[in-house]
Amino acid sequence: PEITALVETGTVNSPVIEVNPGPCFRIAGLNLAFEGRSAEQDEIQEAMSEIGVSEGDIAIPAEIIDVERQLSQFFQNEGYAFADVSNRRVRGDREAATLNITYALDLGDRVRLGETVLPEDSETDAEYILDLQPFEQGEIYAPSKLSSYAARLNELRTFRIANVRLSDEPTGESPEGDAIHD
C-alpha cells in the first residue's frame, strides 16, 4: 500500500492521509510439504477440504495463519498426536496479485493408546478409575478421547486436579507400525 500524508492549507489547516491499498491478492495455490512421514493421499485431500481457505479466495493474513492451527488439529484428530505445522512459505506474484502458500507439516508417528498408568502413590481404586476410560487400549489417538477421560475424572470431584496425557516417549509399536504411548 502507498500512504501519503499532507496538510491542506487554507483558512484552517487540515491533515489529509491518502491510502492506495494496492491490488487485492488471491490465493493461487495451497500445498502441504511433509517433513519426515507423509500422510495418506485421502487424509491430505480431506484436510485440504476442511481448512478455512481455498484456491481463489482473497488472501487474508489472519486466515492464512489460522490454517496452521487447523492443519495441526486435523492431523492430531487423525491419530498423529504430535502433528505440527513447522513452517509456512508464501510466494507472491505482484503482477498477478496471487500467493502460493506451502505449509510444512511434521506429523510424527501415528499414535495408538497404550496402557493407562496411574500414579504410584494413588490411593484411589484403580479398577474404578480404569472403568471410566472412554477408549480401549490399542485405539488410534484422538485429543477428544483424553479430554473426555479427564472430564470424567474431574466430575468425580475426588481429585484436586485430574490430568490425562500421553507418555513423552513411545512404549512400543503396534502390529500396524504405529507408536504406542501409555
Question: How would you describe each model-predicted region?
Answer:
Residues P1-D182:
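Periplasmic polypeptide-binding modules associated with outer-membrane biogenesis and secretion
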